[in-house]
């Protein structure tokens, strides 16, 4: 019995040793995915299926509508994860984006420009 007690007194401190270092600091980062539902610019591109979202298209897609959509999406993205972090998401995946130019407009918007986001973009055909 005495040997068991001595053994426990010797082993237990090693198991709790790692828990003594309370100086470790952790940061929380947010990763998000957002379907922005047809983020198109107003320029008609014959290589894409954007005819509805042009000034002459069925949706009468204007610069005013485009800028408002950019502003609204930027606001939502900037608020993702704010309850647990002091910044917006570290990584964001977006779908239904027409081209790289709309992503550039989005990250240059008032709500997102301070985050210094970069862009990794791939064009893929969408033949709806």
Which residues make up each language-model segment?
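Bacterial Sec-dependent N-terminal signal peptides
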Residues: 1-22
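Short, solvent-exposed loop/turn segments at the edges of secondary structure
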Residues: 4, 127-128
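N-terminal, active-site-proximal structural segment of metallo-dependent hydrolase catalytic domains
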Residues: 16-110, 116-127
């Amino acid at each position: 019995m005495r040997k068991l007690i001595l053994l426990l007194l010797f082993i237990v401190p090693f198991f709790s040793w790692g828990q003594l270092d309370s100086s470790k600091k952790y940061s929380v980062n947010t990763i998000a995915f957002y379907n922005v539902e047809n983020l198109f610019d107003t320029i008609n591109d014959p290589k894409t299926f954007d005819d509805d979202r042009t000034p002459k298209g069925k949706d009468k897609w204007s610069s005013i509508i485009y800028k408002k959509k950019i502003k609204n999406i930027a606001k939502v993205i900037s608020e993702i994860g704010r309850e647990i972090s002091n910044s917006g998401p570290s990584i964001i995946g977006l779908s239904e984006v027409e081209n790289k130019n709309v992503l550039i407009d989005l990250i240059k918007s008032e709500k997102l420009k301070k985050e210094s986001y970069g862009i990794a973009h791939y064009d893929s055909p969408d033949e709806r």
